[in-house]
Amino acid sequence: MAQSVQERTRLKNKRYESGVIPYAKMGYWDPNYVVKDTDILALFRVTPQPGVDPIEASAAVAGESSTATWTVIWCDLLTACDVYRAKAYRVDQVPNSPDQYFAYIAYDLDLFEEGSIANLTASIIGNVFGFKALAALRLEDMRIPIGYLKTFQGPATGVVVERERLNMFGKPFLGATVKPKLGLSSKNYGRVVYEGLKGGLNFLKDDENINSQPFMRWRERFLYVMEGVNRASAATGEIKGSYLNVTAATMEEMYNRAACAKEVGSIIIMIDLVIGYTAIQSMAIWARENNMILHLHRAGNSTYARQKNHGINFRVICKWMRMAGVDHIHAGTVVGKLEGDPIIVKGFYNTLLLPKLDVNLPQGLFFEMDWASLRKTVPVASGGIHAGQMHLLLKYLGDDVVLQFGGGTLGHPDGIQAGATANRVALEAIVLARNEGRDYVNEGPQILKEAARTCGPLQTSLDLWKDISFNFTSTDTADFVETPTANV
């Protein structure tokens, strides 16, 4: 016999409580939840408002970043809400921070559109960061399952392919950013590129805010830059390049500029992080289809990545960008002018380069994660570095990195070409010493001094910048308790 409307409503009311119910009670907190291999996992640093229970705050993050709204709704009965609710399954107090908590949250894979960074982030960071019950919130780490990773293309080239193109193995790539950032004419800009490449660099690059300003329109820049690249390649017999920034106001214009870069012979283009995740993925697809290397400048990242209690940790950006398919990304120098704790920066580099991540709490890596054969993204070290730091750069950053000396090349008293030569000789000397088995880290200053005996430009660099360092306390360091078994 068919049930009446009144009877059906009575049964629904019996199994469904209306009104405002605590998130933890609604199912967004489940300490017994068994994490599935297919779950997307997120670790948040939660700072509840005074008087807010940390478990309820963590459940609220899970709810507001998945299926919840501020009150119970009837439509939940029309979905598999028990499946689609994100589950906060573990809450730990942050060591030495009594008002902060690490909240581990699991998301069912079906909550996310395949191959879309925009959709992934719309849930994970879309609305919850403005939640009033939280004083602050930071996304510290994520685990992306293999099934979801396989819906992304990843980098088109990666380290191995780029080395094969340049015929350069066993040492870092060497480059420089054209300075000043703004104001040069196209012809002078091209001359800077030529001088740097002629002096021994592999690449030069545009800076993040060089697009198409009145003093230098993009098409003229591209033509003069490629003239410099071709002349330097012919003079040195080496494969050279320059990162041409195609960032623009619209996707149509970026495609237009990228096509022009390819037409004039460039092997690499550049974009800025500020263009957004969808635009980044779109340009990555274009670069793959057109056999171009894609360099990403992380312009704007410190607005949300630097502060320890609120925003997004840069290691998460590294994961998203490797998924999106960029071939290069700026990832810190340790010794330069920009933010970068040595151990945390190592975690960034490992995230970009390793085929599989293990838990490493000092580096801020909270999850194991297999990269499902996605190619590596090459880290770029840029900002306040010079030849006298070469041994430290090799120690901290290894071989698979692009070392970008902007002021450390163009600020040389004897000219741009001399600055480039100084950096090239310094790099070759330190790499040779390492390969010969010398203690290149502790002997680094002596090794550079020996090399400078036969290289005047290097001696000038060492004399000029010998006292320059940026020794400031990092604002972002790892939070963990050292134990014999819990840390790597």
From Swiss-Prot:
Active site residues according to the UniProt entry: K179, H297
GO CC term (a single one): chloroplast
Record-listed N6-carboxylysine modification sites: K205
Additional notes on this entry: The basic functional RuBisCO is composed of a large chain homodimer in a 'head-to-tail' conformation. In form I RuBisCO this homodimer is arranged in a barrel-like tetramer with the small subunits forming a tetrameric 'cap' on each end of the 'barrel'.
UniProt: Mg(2+) binding residues: K205, D207, E208
EC numbers on record: 4.1.1.39
A biological-process GO annotation: reductive pentose-phosphate cycle
InterPro entries attached to this UniProt entry: RuBisCO, RuBisCo_large_chain_AS, RuBisCO_lsu_C, RuBisCO_lsu_C_sf, RuBisCO_lsu_fd_N, RuBisCO_lsu_N_sf, RuBisCO_lsuI
CC cofactor note: Binds 1 Mg(2+) ion per subunit.
Positions marked as site (Transition state stabilizer): K337
Matching SUPFAM superfamilies: RuBisCo, C-terminal domain, RuBisCO, large subunit, small (N-terminal) domain
Alphabetically ordered keywords of this record: Calvin cycle, Carbon dioxide fixation, Chloroplast, Lyase, Magnesium, Metal-binding, Monooxygenase, Oxidoreductase, Photorespiration, Photosynthesis, Plastid
GO molecular-function terms, A-Z: magnesium ion binding; monooxygenase activity; ribulose-bisphosphate carboxylase activity
Major subcellular site: plastid
Reactions catalysed according to its record: 2 (2R)-3-phosphoglycerate + 2 H(+) = D-ribulose 1,5-bisphosphate + CO2 + H2O; D-ribulose 1,5-bisphosphate + O2 = 2-phosphoglycolate + (2R)-3-phosphoglycerate + 2 H(+)
Name of one Pfam family that matches: RuBisCO_large_N
Residues holding substrate: N127, T177, K181, R298, H330, S382
Lineage: Eukaryota, Rhodophyta, Bangiophyceae, Cyanidiales, Cyanidiaceae
Location of the protein in the cell: Plastid, Chloroplast
The protein's name: Ribulose bisphosphate carboxylase large chain
Required cofactor names: Mg(2+)
PROSITE patterns: RUBISCO_LARGE
Assembly behavior: Heterohexadecamer of 8 large chains and 8 small chains.
Task performed by this protein: RuBisCO catalyzes two reactions: the carboxylation of D-ribulose 1,5-bisphosphate, the primary event in carbon dioxide fixation, as well as the oxidative fragmentation of the pentose substrate in the photorespiration process. Both reactions occur simultaneously and in competition at the same active site.
Similarity field: Belongs to the RuBisCO large chain family. Type I subfamily.
PANTHER family with a match to the protein in the record: RIBULOSE BISPHOSPHATE CARBOXYLASE, RIBULOSE BISPHOSPHATE CARBOXYLASE LARGE CHAIN
